[in-house]
Every structure is written in C-alpha cells, then in structure tokens.
A protein has these predicted regions:
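Conserved glycine-rich "GG(E/T)P / GGGxP" loop and the immediately following alpha-helix
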Residues: 13-145
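Radical SAM enzyme core and accessory elements
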Residues: 1-13
Length: 145
C-alpha cells in the first residue's frame, strides 16, 4: 500500500481536498513578507517530470477525484521558473486534476498563456501577486532590481 494511503485530515468538519506540490525550489524575488527574503536559499532545482507523474499517479491510486482532485503550486517559489511547468500542467490535464496557480507574474510566457487558454477547464484558481503598481515601491517590496 502507498505511504499516501491514509484518511483525509479533517479540520472543523471539513476534509482537505488539495495536494500541494513544490515543483521547484526557487523564486526570482525576495519579497519582505516572504521567508525567501530571510532564509538561506535552497539549491535551485526543479522536480523531475517522471517524479511528478509518479506523484500524480500515487495520488489518483489512493484518492478518487471526489476525495482529492486539486493540486496547488502555492509554495514559497515561482512555479513558472520550472522549464517543464507546461509539461506538468499537461500531465495534470491528462489525468483530470485541477490546479491552483499563484505567481508573481514575471515568468508568464506565451507558451503558458496559450496552454491556459486552450485548457481552461482545469484551472481552479490563477492568481497573480502584484503588490503595487508603483515601480519604486514594487522594487522595494520584491527586492527586484
């Protein structure tokens, strides 16, 4: 039996129905409100596509789509820095998973937007974190140059 096989946790009577996957370990910003601004940076690595596919398969083996169907890339990273990110979204689409995407927007490519337009049925949430429209304040907040 998979080590993932366990009852879904309950919190105030609600079952969690989302899995969070860190597809890469880095971010291109150092926002003052994020641990990335203060922690020792992790090595810049992206999850192998085969490992990602294995994780999706294991989740689907243990949980039905009604039990767990959403994947979030909402960790302290920028998911779009992963060169295989669109491939991972294609795997998720092919296996019927929904995804939640939070990005600082800096690495959104034409390839990604074209994919999202063609497959809107798998987008649960797509959020951009743009802390201000003022350029100086934006640089101060994000640590960008």
């Amino acid at each position: 039996m998979s080590e993932l096989a366990r009852p879904l946790p309950e919190f105030h009577g609600f079952n969690y129905r989302i899995a969070q996957i860190e597809n890469n370990t880095h971010c291109n910003y150092k926002c003052w409100f994020c641990p990335n601004a203060y922690d020792t940076p992790a090595p810049k690595e992206c999850m192998d596509l085969d490992l990602f596919a294995k994780i999706l398969t294991e989740i689907r083996t243990v949980y039905t789509p009604l039990e767990l169907n959403d994947i979030s890339f909402a960790t302290y990273n920028e998911p779009n820095l992963d060169d295989t990110f669109t491939d991972k979204l294609q795997l998720m689409t092919a296996t019927g998973f929904m995804y939640e995407h939070i990005s600082n927007g800096s690495m959104i490519t034409t390839e990604l937007t074209d994919f999202l337009i063609k497959h809107p049925q798998n987008i649960k949430n797509f959020r951009l974190n743009i802390p201000t429209l003022d350029e100086k304040k934006w640089k101060d907040i994000t640590g960008a140059s």
